[in-house]
Regions:
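Generic detector of multi-pass transmembrane helix bundles and their immediately adjacent loops
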Residues: 297, 310-492
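Hydrophobic alpha-helical segments embedded in or immediately adjacent to the lipid bilayer
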Residues: 288-308
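Membrane-embedded alpha-helical signal segments
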Residues: 1-293, 311, 431-492
Length: 492
């Protein structure tokens, strides 16, 4: 960009394809006795805001300014907070398509960018994919500025750092890397920044796409990052020393490094008394184990180890099985596929009919299958319990991994019996211990053993949770060095 207004406008018109882009606008006017132009994208700016705070002051500037003074005079005349100078045409175009207005004047090298964004966006609403029992009923939305504000309202401290950067080679999008300066593990932060620098893609559509570009083991069945739309959950992980990634246009945020326990815990556990939190965690753990192992164990015992079952139960199964034309493994596979189909359909249909569709479809199909003597009733109960267990898993990605593992474990149990199940679970545990998330052990703090809070599978009292993080060695890794309940004379 040079000082020739006509040449600069021609260059911008070419880069913006104004001949075929009707929403790329330019207005010419005079300010400080010089010809000037303002470029903006209709729909991304507030027209009233630009007219009142930008154009009106500049059009009424009748003074004369030299080429070296014009930029400073415009800055003084316009009462806007965010004003930046840019000299590269690509940077100027990036400012325009992000909702800024760009002012060019004759004799001024480069352009001045003014933040006059006013695009319509969704307001703050409760989380749509994570139910809230206790805690704030606020969820992230598609505006990165709103999402950053929600986190800063929960953690009002200058130690909360939010580094803004652009990601995407052809169509960049804003990305914010947030962490607590005094709690984050510096090696994990450096590793994340290095990975972000090495991401080369034309455009990042969603936070889920970014997850696939950053995770340590892209072919692993288990997710290695936490995705959430609850600000309180993201804030609690920031306090643990983890890093939160916010992408403009995505209502979820990405948290890493993460462990398996982070995928099983919920903010409601922390907001509840430790006895209640322990009960809820044990129920979720039971649901996960039922979802993963119950169908395979049923098939293995009925097919390979019937002598291990009670006589009355075995007699009932054999009597009903005699009238069914399919084998037990095939029955189980068909019913699991049917229940997964019902669950997927209930998600895709409109929300007002989704829950009704899931309940009615499950009841009708199950009853029809039993009456048609395609399956026996006990198998329907096993499939229903395992399906409920998979929906009790709080993380959506982990729930999908459990449902896929359920089918793999069913295959192992159908071929090798209980021995196949034991071998599969052993291989799963070995794989779990070898996984990492941003270089941190995914099975932390159990493997490898390290100092940690007692808050693992069970919910321990809050005042016993002194360690800040499991996944790194931050400078300040203690949440409290004194007694949290200092008033309690019993020393708790």
């Amino acid at each position: 960009m040079n000082g020739d207004l006509r040449e600069n406008c021609r260059l911008l018109d070419e880069k913006l394809h104004r001949a075929v882009n009707p929403d790329m606008h330019v207005r010419f006017f005079r300010t400080f006795s010089r010809d000037a132009a303002v470029y903006y994208v209709d729909g991304l700016i507030s027209t009233d805001f630009m007219q009142h705070y930008l154009l009106f002051p500049l059009q009424n500037a009748a003074e004369t300014a030299s080429s070296g003074e014009i930029a400073g005079c415009i800055r003084q005349r316009v009462a806007l907070c965010e004003v930046e100078a840019f000299f590269d045409v690509r940077e100027i175009v990036a400012q325009l398509v992000s909702g800024h207005a760009v002012v060019l004047t004759d004799g001024m090298d480069g352009a001045l960018s003014f933040d006059v964004r006013g695009a319509v966006r969704r307001g703050i609403s409760p989380p749509l994919t994570e139910s809230v029992v206790r805690g704030p009923h606020q969820g992230f939305n598609e505006s990165i500025r709103d999402s950053i504000t929600l986190l800063r309202r929960i953690l009002p401290t200058p130690e909360l750092i939010g580094e803004m950067r652009q990601i995407g080679d052809a169509i960049p999008v804003s990305l914010c890397v947030m962490y607590l300066q005094n709690a984050v593990d510096k090696s994990s932060l450096s590793r994340l920044k290095a990975r972000l620098e090495e991401v080369h893609i034309d455009h990042v559509l969603s936070i889920g796409a970014l997850e696939q570009l950053l995770e340590d083991h892209p072919f692993s069945l288990l997710p290695q990052c936490v995705m959430t739309e609850r600000p309180d959950r993201a804030a609690s992980m920031l306090l643990e020393g983890q890093i939160v990634l916010l992408l403009d246009g995505s209502p979820q945020v990405l948290v890493l490094p993460a462990s398996l326990l982070h995928l099983l815990h919920t903010p409601d556990d922390t907001s509840s008394r430790w006895l209640y939190g322990t009960f809820m965690r044990l129920i979720r753990l039971l649901g996960l184990l039922c979802a993963l192992m119950l169908p395979a164990l049923f098939v293995a015992f009925v097919t390979f180890h019937p002598q291990a079952l009670p006589a009355a139960l075995l007699t009932s199964i054999l009597e009903s099985q005699a009238e069914v034309p399919l084998s037990v493994p095939l029955e189980m596979l068909l019913m699991l596929i049917m229940f997964n189909l019902v669950g997927e359909a209930s998600i895709r249909v409109p929300s007002l009919t989704g829950s009704t569709l899931g309940t009615v479809s499950g009841l009708i199909l199950g009853q029809a299958a039993v009456e048609a003597k395609l399956v026996h009733p006990l198998l329907i109960i096993v499939v229903a319990v395992s399906s409920l267990g998979s929906y009790a898993v709080p993380d959506y990605s982990l729930g999908l991994a459990v449902r896929i593992g359920q089918l793999l474990l069913l295959a192992a149990g159908s071929i090798f019996g209980v021995y196949g199940i034991v071998l599969f679970m052993t291989a799963l545990c070995v794989r779990l211990c070898s996984l990492t998330s941003l270089g941190a052990p995914f099975a932390a703090p159990l493997s490898p053993p390290r100092a940690h809070n007692p808050d693992l599978l069970t919910r321990h009292p809050l005042w016993q949770q002194r360690w800040r993080t499991w996944l790194g060695s931050a400078e300040n890794n203690m949440r409290s060095r004194g007694r949290m309940r200092g008033w309690d004379r019993r020393g708790q």
